[in-house]
């Protein structure tokens, strides 16, 4: 094995500084004359904003600014950036609702920012936020992407029928239908892949600083891809040349995909810094993180596998609904689709057909999280393989071995979007079975039942 071979262990050099408390995270950093922000968030999943009274908050001790969505809109600000290049059923671009950094007229998920308060201290900002009176008129809400697709479900947007942001299809429907019609066996399962949250050690935080001398916004925050965010923020949120946006990131206390998105707070802090003429810092507490961080996964899947009497796989069929949330996050459209290329797993499957709906619901946005759709794919196919083995009364390991793609077949063109260029899948299976002592499992099960 060469010095830099694939799979070779790499000695970590970064740990001593972090383990001895010498890391430099956002909450370790403070600017001269820095102010603090607190965000009043929606307690409703879906509601019209009838009125907002901020009079008492504006005169509270230490307060410098109390701003609403109307202030944000009146100042000419844009939307929280998003990327998405899928299409709807008619071939038109996917539906991406405008996402203001502060709610305007209506809230569509619990935790959405409604009012921004800036004060000398965080405590003063929080006290002032409790003086704000927001009157809401609650509306029917839907949180399940499966239920949101049904006729009669609450609609988040008038111009988005059935709450379907996009529709994606891959594979050969005719060939797959024919294979299912001829198959000796079919197993099917309705899978609920639950929503999860990253819950990183370091809560999200932002420092915004506007320099009136050169008109440049500085955004200090934990990012995964600042070089990509810079242009998106300039074009979609601040409507300024890219050179007027400066992004700074320090040590990051965990991400797992969480920090690969652009959040409203990342727009609000530089914007309000320009208004008050001083740097502004916001750091979420743990409860606020659970209300405002992008979540992961949340898919409903109807999956079926067709196979012969001897266990030979013939086709797979998938109908999936992915929960995008009330808006489409920066990369949130991708995970429900990204996994499709690996939906057949490591098995020789002649044909497949997949249909996916990206759904809008009254929940917080989802984003790529730890594998960005691929673990969901593995879960789908492996559950079906287990069910097939059960129906045939066959050892699941041997059913896998029977259908596994041999290394001699590489490169292997799957019936979906990928071509596998290499892989020693049968060898991987052998190693896994040996390490898990698969042969000894029946005896261990008997012992556990005793």
Question: Residue ranges of each PLM-predicted region?
Answer:
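Flexible, low-hydrophobicity surface segments
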Residues: 1-161, 165, 275
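Glycine-rich loop/linker segments at domain edges
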Residues: 8, 14-17, 83-97, 163-206, ...
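Short coil/turn connectors at secondary-structure junctions
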Residues: 33-36, 60-64, 104, 111-114, ...
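Alpha-helical support elements that line or immediately flank enzyme active sites
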Residues: 39-73, 115-135, 206-276, 333-342, ...
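Beta-strand segments within the central parallel beta-sheet cores of soluble alpha/beta enzyme folds
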Residues: 69, 243-250, 277-287, 314-319, ...
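Short acidic, glycine/serine/threonine-rich loops at helix termini
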Residues: 77-81, 128-131, 199, 230-232, ...
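Glycine-rich and small/hydrophobic secondary-structure elements
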Residues: 83-124, 257-309, 366-391, 413-438
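Helix-loop-helix junctions that connect adjacent transmembrane helices in secondary transporters/permeases
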Residues: 153-237, 406-450
């Amino acid at each position: 094995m060469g010095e830099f071979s694939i799979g070779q262990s790499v000695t970590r050099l970064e740990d001593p500084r972090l383990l001895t408390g010498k890391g430099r995270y956002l909450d370790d950093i403070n600017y001269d004359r820095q102010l603090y922000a607190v965000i009043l968030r929606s307690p409703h999943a879906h509601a019209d904003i009838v009125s907002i009274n901020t009079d008492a908050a504006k005169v509270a001790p230490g307060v410098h600014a109390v701003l609403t969505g109307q202030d944000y809109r009146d100042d000419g600000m844009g939307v929280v950036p998003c990327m998405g290049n899928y299409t709807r059923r008619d071939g038109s671009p996917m539906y991406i609702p405008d996402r203001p950094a502060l709610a305007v007229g209506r809230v569509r998920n619990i935790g959405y920012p409604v009012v921004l308060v800036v004060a000398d201290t965080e405590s003063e900002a929080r006290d002032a936020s409790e003086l704000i009176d927001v009157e809401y008129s609650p509306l029917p809400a839907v949180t399940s992407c499966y239920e949101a697709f049904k006729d009669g479900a609450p609609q988040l947007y008038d111009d988005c029928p059935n709450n379907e942001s996009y529709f994606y299809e891959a594979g050969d429907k005719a060939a797959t239908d024919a294979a299912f019609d001829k198959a000796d066996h079919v197993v099917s399962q309705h899978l609920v892949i639950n929503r999860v949250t990253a819950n990183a050690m370091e809560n999200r935080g932002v420092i915004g600083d506007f320099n009136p001398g050169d008109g440049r916004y500085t955004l200090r925050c934990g990012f995964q891809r600042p070089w990509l965010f810079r242009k998106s923020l300039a074009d979609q949120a601040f409507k300024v040349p890219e050179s007027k946006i400066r992004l700074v990131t320090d040590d990051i206390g965990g991400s797992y995909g969480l920090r690969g998105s652009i959040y409203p707070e990342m727009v609000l802090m530089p914007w309000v810094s320009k208004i008050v003429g001083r740097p502004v810092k916001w750091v979420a507490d743990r409860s606020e993180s659970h209300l405002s961080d992008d979540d992961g996964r949340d898919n409903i899947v109807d999956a079926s596998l067709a196979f012969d009497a001897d266990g030979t796989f013939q086709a797979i069929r998938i109908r999936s609904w992915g929960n995008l949330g009330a808006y489409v996050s920066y990369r949130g459209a991708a995970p429900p689709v990204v996994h499709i290329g690996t939906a057949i797993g490591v098995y020789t499957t002649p044909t497949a057909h997949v249909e996916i709906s990206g759904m809008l619901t009254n929940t917080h946005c989802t984003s790529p999280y730890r594998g960005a759709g691929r673990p969901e794919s593995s879960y789908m196919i492996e559950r079906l393989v287990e069910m097939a083995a059960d129906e045939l009364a066959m050892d699941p390991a041997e059913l896998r071995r029977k259908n596994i793609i041999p290394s001699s077949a590489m490169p292997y063109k799957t019936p979906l979007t990928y071509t596998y260029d290499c892989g020693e899948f049968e060898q991987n299976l052998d190693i896994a079975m040996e390490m898990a002592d698969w042969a000894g499992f029946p005896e261990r099960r008997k012992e556990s039942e005793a």
